[in-house]
Every structure is written in C-alpha cells, then in structure tokens.
C-alpha cells in the first residue's frame, strides 16, 4: 500500500545513504530516506513524498535517540545542510564512511579487497582553507553572508560556519558591515541587480596568508582603497585582495576576469613540502592537513624507487607527483587545465633545479595523452590517477594497462566510480591490493579513497 503524504510512522533508522540521510523501512518494506537521522534512532517520521519503491520523509520527533547521536552545535545546520552529519559522533561518522566504501567496492566493483578503517581528519571543525560565501540580505535587509539552503538559491545567513577558521568568518562579517556602511548592494538573482555576488576567501594553513576575493558584476568597486586599508589594518594576515568579475546570469561562481586591488594577486603555502601559489582559480584540496595524510598514503602505495618513471595523470597543480619527485628518476604530469599546468611548472621550479630537471608537465586531456604516450611506447613504472568525480573513462584505463606499469595508485573523491574502475582494472590484469578511505570532509558524507593495484599479467 503506498505511503501517504503527511503520514507519520515510527521507524528505526538502519544505516546512512550515500547523501547522509538515514535509511529506514516501512512496515511494507518500502525504503524511506530521512535527513538528520542517525543509525539506531527510533523516530516519528513524516512522509513528504512517495516515489513507489522508495519514499522521502522528515524527522518529526526522536523517540529513542541513537547512542551515536550528539547535540548539534550550529543553529543553522538544518536549513544550511552543509554539515549533513553534524548530529553524529565522529567515531560513528568514520564507521559509516568505511561501510559505504566497503559496500561500493563489493557491490559495484564485485571485489572483496581489504578496506582499511578510514583515516580521521586531524581537525574535524575549522578545517577548511577555502570558503565561497554567497552574499545576500538578512531578514532586516542588511547584507549578510551564508550558504544556499538545500536545493534552493535562498541564502541562509551563517555568520559563524563551524567548518571555516574563525578568521575567515570574521572577515566575511566585516565585509558585510562595510557593504552596509557604504551602501554597496548585494547581487539579487531575481532582478539581476546589485554588485557583490560572493565573498571568496582562501587561507594558507602553513603560511597563514589570506586571500580576499570579491566576486562582483563589474570591476569597479566603490570605496575600494578604503576597503583595502580597513581590511589589512584589522587582519594583518591578508596578503592580497582581488575583484573577480562575473556579470553573467549563471550559477558558476567565478568569471574569467580578475583584478588585483592589493598585494601580488595570490597567496603562498606548502603541501607536503611542495611550495604553491594560490589564486582564485587554483584547484587545491580544502583540508590541507588531511590532504597531506592522503598524499602520504599515495606515496606509500606507490613504492617508488630511484630508477622509476612516475606518470601522474589528472595532475592538477602537480602537488601529488611533486611531493614524490625526490623518490623517482622522472616525473611526467598531465592535466587539461592550462592554468594548472603553468602552476605545476612553477611549483617544480620553486623546488629547485634538481626537481625541475626531472619533471615534465603537459596540458592535455588525460585519456588522449595516455593513449598517445602508450602509442609512443612509454612504460612508466608507476601511474598515479586522480580523476574528477566521474572517474576514468575506458580509453584512459586501457592506455594505462597498455603502458604496463608495475603499480597503479588511484585517488578518488567518489568511492562508487573508484569501485567501478577497480573492477575494470581487475579484469585487465591488475589486482586490487587494498583501499584506504581518508576523511577530508568531516561532518559531511564525502570521503576520499586511495586504492593500489599491482600488475598480475
């Protein structure tokens, strides 16, 4: 019998889904997905939509709380939705992430590969080195920063996001005060009027340097010099202030035009000893300390020797490969984004002549480059794969297998696509040795995985 809208059921939450919702079953066996619940909760659930084989519900009341449930310490955690697991004890969060990775490799990959316990993040709050606050107005009409409520473009004001360092929240709030005092208008998506769309902040965890970037509909910002003086006087770690221009009617945050108001236009930091320069368009892991753990695992799995050639596909700014360059004979990196390749070359140069001499970076599609390198007879000893969420296409994996590396190390932000690609590699002569989940995103459902493969044929 179909579930009815607004019907209330008492259900026991069994597990978490991939998006962090609790999963329960109705008396008739229909799966019900309920955000904000924890495995072990017994709760009154109100049905909001029945889709036939499954339904969606909302939490009406907790009747018996899960032993893993903890108090939520953020007033806007519900409507904001950014911290989908903020109500869950961190040990339970790690267990859930480990179970999700294990399930993906067994169900999608068909593999009984050892999945190690997830590596916890060194920090579970205030860990992000980057934030992109949309700018809007609060209920009193004052400019505010916040985040979009789930599946909407309604801004939930959030003056103190628990995932951001205090200083980034403080800078965001100071900017809103400045906008209000000088009648600088937030952009309104409904009317396409206003100036400031986003406040984009970066912080170098090791350097302490901060980048402030205002995403605006035009390059001219009223009182820009006064703003620079006020910000740098109050926040001494601000190294650069920029305006990024995005006048399009789009959901894309950044435009292609950036102007520097103060400083060099970038900040500096290090990641696993690799010196990097970061601007608004730079791709960089948002949890620096956990990323260093992840890179350490990748290096351990690579088992490089001084005679090895390392091929780093989807290399980005080159940080993974360059962090291992001391341990191999030659490094080749491939990335499709031109700015990232220029950054990779500059990062190699900053590491000194010896690293620069053994490192080569090419701007190309990873699959096409891998196919060309395979056709040219390149035989890397180790291949590093760090694809986007969609994973590798078959042409890329086929080219990797043709090059016949001794080992393949696969870094992924999507356990499901990593498991799919693991199955392909297993079917083409590479055995999955082990999988290490690494928690780069505490309080959320996301989890990175590192897996390694050895040649068997």
Question: What residues fall within each predicted segment?
Answer:
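Terminal RNA-binding accessory module
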Residues: 1-72, 76, 361, 368
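Rossmann-like S-adenosyl-L-methionine
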Residues: 2-10, 18, 219-457
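Short, acidic/hydrophobic/Gly-rich beta-strand patch recurrent on exposed beta strands
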Residues: 22-27, 146-149, 213-215, 344
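Short, conserved phosphate/pyrophosphate- and ester-handling motifs at nucleotide-, phospho-/glycolipid
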Residues: 40, 164, 287
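Short beta-strand micro-motifs enriched in acidic
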Residues: 46-50, 134-138, 202-206, 456
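Extended interfacial segments that mediate partner engagement and assembly in macromolecular machines
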Residues: 60-72, 78-186, 206, 221
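Short, solvent-exposed loop/turn elements at beta->coil junctions and helix N-caps
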Residues: 116-124, 189, 198, 202, ...
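Carbohydrate-binding surface patches
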Residues: 200-204, 210-220
